[in-house]
Amino acid sequence: MWQAKDTVGYRNSLDMYERAFSLFPDSIDEDGLYRVSVLASGLKEYDKAFKYLTLLFELKPNLPWAPNWSYILGEDSENEYKNLLSDVRWNDLRQKALKAKQTFYEELNVNEKEFYAVDEVSLCKVKDGKALYGEFRKKFGYLPKKSQNYSVSFAINDSIKTSFFVHLPKDYNPNKSYPLLFFLHGAVRYNQLSDYQLASWVLYDWNRYYTKYAERNEVILVFPKGSRKFNWMTSDDGFFMIPKIVALVKKTLNVDDDKVFISGHSNGATGAFSYLMKQPSLFAGFYGFNTYPKVFTGGTFVENIKNRSFINFSTDKDYYYPPNANDDFTQLMNSINADYKEFRYNGFSHSFPQFDESEPAYGILFSDLLKRQRNPFPKEISWEFDDECYGNIDWLSNIKLDTLAVRKDWHKVKNFKINRWLKYDEKDSLVVMEVDRMAFDFPRKSGKIVAKYENNIFRIETSCVKSFSVNISPEMIDMGKKVRIYLNGNLCFDKRIGYDTDFMLQNFNTTRDKIQIWINQIHIQEGQGVPYSCKSKKQMATY
């Protein structure tokens, strides 16, 4: 129970609530009934406790803050209502709550099945590659949705699951493609996985402007739920979640593949930045509120931003990442001609989205989102990585490290020093702290690849890279002509490329991308001493 100096304080609180209920009966809500029922239980006012607890259980608000059964079956319930446990009325309520919980989960399952319902035709029997490519490009199988909001379960592994929440445009039309925006929550170290989410948890309060502008501009919103172990910032254990959820959503909703975006606040903004650094291919653009622009699971290779874009909404009183560091980071971004913008809002702390003054930032975000599109087949790519799980970027994939190789002269580290940080002192005042730290850590050796193509000719330079694959699309080459690949100035592949239907199906089932479709793959491996060789259905070259 909430702390008071003595029983008199609890009694006064109970009396205050009851007077308010009497004066304003139309304003009785979940929070009030919950608090007064706990107070009455603590004061051993059994009849009042059961009266208000029953009203709480039977309340049907338009926007519930918790399922009604959770107040009775929650992990804290037996402690909060410990004085009621021996009363037969508690057991009666508990039995009703158990039935309500069962019904709640049954309805979740029904809604989830309806969410995933599609009228999809199997493509496994299509053996002609060109025809299969045409089928992939179609917007097929999508159905209308009965609801605007869906809480969808998500299996992390065989024994652990969480959820993601989907908010659709009001008049969602399955024949129309929509932009998709992910929001990553912060405070990942203090969050827990949840097998369901409610609209009241994600669409309002600090997220109210996401909801407002998404509804105004017909953007699909997705809110995943992470935890200390499974998240998008501090651990790679949960980094797979967002790409997997993208594929699941694309399977059932008509998403514009070139307009998938990701945003977040605090740890969530750092998560959005991490996908930009490590796994950007699915996305068109990245945004962050109060961002700490650093990869916490490995090196931060800032030139990777040149493959996409980032907009950072910062404040000058942020303990999470100080304004002087943001200034230096912006200067670094400008020096490499990155598509990066920072908008500084002075006078605000780390909790910037809490304030109404943050609304213009969301206007900027959605204005950019509406104009921006992914280039699925960029003419040039620059990619650096230190973990082979993230050796993929657009039409380059399966990039493997050569940790014994000597770094090329053009393969340079970019970093800067941070000398000042903001922190709260014992009086809860924000003060400047002198520090001596580098902006980024580099715990492992990295590899880098720079590639470009034009007129069926690919020119690729590598540093500390052992092998890689070049993904091929008919949008990139003339299928009637040979493809030539020059690796570090030497011709290593010179052949025509055909369609590989098995590879096409496997890749499509993984990404559900109807635009960035690969019809074959050329594998390049250094150091074999022969011009090239072919292996299986995939084209393989060794140099």
Predicted regions and their residues:
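Helix-turn-helix repeat elements of alpha-solenoid scaffolds
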Residues: 2-18
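Alpha/beta-hydrolase-fold serine-hydrolase catalytic core, especially in secreted/extracellular enzymes
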Residues: 8, 12, 43, 95-125, ...
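TPR/TPR-like alpha-solenoid helical repeat scaffolds
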Residues: 30-43, 64-96
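A domain-start/cap signature at the N-terminus of enzymes
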Residues: 85, 89-178, 496-508
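Gly/Ser-rich "nucleophile elbow"/oxyanion-hole loop immediately N-terminal to the catalytic nucleophile
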Residues: 170-176, 230-266
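Primarily recognizes the serine-hydrolase "nucleophile elbow" in alpha/beta-hydrolase
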Residues: 250-252, 257-306
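The feature captures the conserved acid-bearing segment of alpha/beta-hydrolase catalytic domains
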Residues: 285, 290-370
